[in-house]
Amino acid sequence: MIEFNRFKLDNGLTVLHHFDSTTPMAVVNTLYDVGARDESEEKTGFAHLFEHLMFGGSVNIPDFDAPLQRAGGESNAFTSNDITNYYDTLPIQNIETALWLESDRMLSLAFTPKSLEVQRNVVIEEFKQRYLNQPYGDVWLELRPLAYKQHPYKWATIGKKIEHIEEATMDDVKAFFKAHYHPANAILCIAGNIPFEETKRLVKKWYGDIPASLKPQRILPKEPVQKEFRELTIERKVPNDAFYYSFKMPERRSFEYYVTDIISDALGREKSSRLYSKLKKELKLVTSINAYITGSIDEGLLIIDGKLSDDVSFEQLDAALWAVLEDLRTELMSEAETSKLLNKIRTVKEFQEQGLLNRAMNLCLYELLGDANGVNEENNLYQSITAEQMKAVANQILKKENCSLLRVKSIKE
């Protein structure tokens, strides 16, 4: 159970407070309700570029990292298709340093040509190293537009193409900041050995004078129901042939999302999972195989990926893989397997709650989804899942007309 308090500033900033007297550290976590799905299709990669720009200094503080490091702290951030999340960890007695830094860059990020050019080059280099010049690196650049035809999930967080980052202007950057980086579009969580009233005082001191803005209205194109099997084969200089089966799955706020998560565990989370046992251990068709979900807020994907063993064809794999999926669709899962999966997810969630940063981030995420208390209800939702529900959802999702398959064929030197 993660206990928390909640309050809201007049400028629209939602604040969560989580008290933990057992740690000398504090976490300041800021979630901005903006991700790659909020970008224009002609100007992608901006949410991720902004993650980098936010460390380029603000008007009053030219170097973000140095003051935090002097206070014994560290910071980092991540961007997804749905959110951008910034976090600072530091000794509790120095928490005002983090509040000073975070509030100042929310108020007045430094828009200098030098900062834009430096961070643009960093992102371009990341694009090249991680997505263009790395084996299997461009998989998501190919798979997303295969699986999605209308929704902005059809491009990766890094961006649709490198030219969008290269051509980003100062006016583009300022407009993106003005639209998304303000109190009404943020959720702040303060976690650690700090009383609620002191948290309220400090947050009002540092954030209270930031001007209010209207939360942007999000109107995204709805992804049509997929009615046909899609496939694409690309050739790349990679060590082994690889495969990526993607299935559309329910959105994050639905009960079926949790059921699909357990189904992915049944298929490929561990060495005892169905796909690993059948395709790797028994048939030796693959050298690796995994199943997981993207965790998206809107309609996401269940992914099955892996690499073929030598001298195994995609056709051999395909027949065996669909046979495993058919078993899950038609046969009721045993009580023993169901219990094992639910016990495992309980253990994983309990372990995740051990870390102060994880608690702060999850509180922010669930507040964005509708109510921070959802983090405390999550385990009960998982534990209520039945074998009958898994069979029903598997029937809904694991069918050929709901699948987009990307094959990566190895070109031998």
Question: Where are the regions a protein language model picked out?
Answer:
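M16/insulysin-pitrilysin zinc metalloprotease superfamily fold
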Residues: 57, 89-122, 290, 294-352
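M16/MPP (pitrilysin/insulinase) zinc-metallopeptidase core fold and M16-derived inactive scaffolds
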Residues: 27-89, 155-158, 269-285
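Buried hydrophobic packing residues in well-ordered domains
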Residues: 12, 30, 48, 86, ...
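Histidine-acidic residue clusters that define the catalytic metal-binding segment
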Residues: 1-6, 145-186, 218-223, 349, ...
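His/Glu-based metal-binding/catalytic segments typifying zinc-dependent metallopeptidases
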Residues: 20, 29-31, 145, 215-274, ...
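A structural supersecondary motif
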Residues: 165, 244-248, 267-308
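C-terminal regions of mature proteins
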Residues: 187-192, 328-332, 336-413
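An aromatic/glycine/proline-enriched structural segment found at the starts
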Residues: 2-5, 149-150, 154, 182-251, ...
